Regions:
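C-terminal alpha-helical "lid/dimerization" subdomain adjacent to the S-adenosyl-L-methionine
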Residues: 147-204
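Conserved class I S-adenosyl-L-methionine
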Residues: 1-38
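Short catalytic micro-motifs in class I SAM-dependent methyltransferases
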Residues: 117-118
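A short glycine-rich, Lys/Arg-flanked "PGG" loop and its adjoining helix->strand segment in the class I
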Residues: 128-140
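A conserved beta-strand element that flanks and buttresses the S-adenosyl-L-methionine
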Residues: 114
Length: 226
């Protein structure tokens, strides 16, 4: 069954188990918070903020940070509003689809942007537009952090990825290539390969690199020159 992000029950269940089956995410988030300590204070865009878990971590770890959280799920945003209420004017939450960011009013000199497990729902054209919009809303030397699912590039490589996912305790872990493709389709996931994401970042004007890649999970970073 496809993920129903508009269903309050599904949103609550996801919020309760957001790192289950993804052992790389906790370490990537820890690394994100460490790097953000060196980032200038100011607005941080949270693309696909969901239930506000990442925003809360950032606000707790960086006193000068303000978060503009964007998400298309009203159910997720309701959880985020409750979670982030105590932070008052440091948080602004907006219901917005990542496929139509040009409709969003956002600061144009943000110090950073983060996208955690959100961009893999976009096709390549939509992904390119989201990256370019993000670039345009960052201050010179602003950072873009992407923590997300990555495409497994070819069927003949799948068994190696399957074994790694099994060792890491990732779930679900389809046994074969056809099962993997079916799982992606059912969930509406369209992950891009590392090289594809880096290409989109460079096209937009970012200096970029894959900071940490573990099979089909990775942390990629881009920085606007300035």
């Amino acid at each position: 069954m496809a993920k129903n992000w508009q269903d309050p029950a599904f949103a609550e269940a996801w919020d309760a188990r957001h790192v289950v089956g993804n052992p790389a995410r906790a370490e990537h988030l820890s690394l994100l918070l460490t790097i953000l300590e060196e980032v200038a204070s100011g607005w941080i865009l949270d693309l696909g903020c969901g239930s506000g878990l990442i925003a809360q971590m950032v606000l707790d770890g960086k006193a000068g940070a303000r978060i503009l959280g964007l998400d298309s799920s009203a159910a997720m945003l309701e959880i985020a509003k409750e979670r982030l209420g105590p932070y008052d004017e440091r948080v602004q939450l907006t219901e917005a689809d990542l496929t139509s960011l040009d409709r969003v009013k956002a600061p144009t000199e943000c110090s950073a942007a983060i996208a955690v497990q959100s961009l893999h729902h976009l096709d390549e054209t939509q992904y390119r537009a989201a990256v370019r919009w993000t670039f345009e809303h960052l201050a010179p030397r602003g950072w873009f952090f992407i923590i997300d699912r990555l495409a497994i590039p070819a069927e003949r490589l799948y068994s190696a990825f399957h074994n790694l996912r099994e060792r890491q305790g990732q779930s679900p872990n389809p046994a074969d290539w056809s099962g993997y493709l079916e799982w992606l389709e059912v969930n509406g996931d369209r992950p891009l390969p590392v090289q594809g994401i880096l290409r989109l970042l460079e096209e937009a004007g970012f200096q970029s690199t894959a900071l940490d890649v573990r099979g089909d999970r990775g942390m990629l970073i881009g920085r606007r020159p300035g």
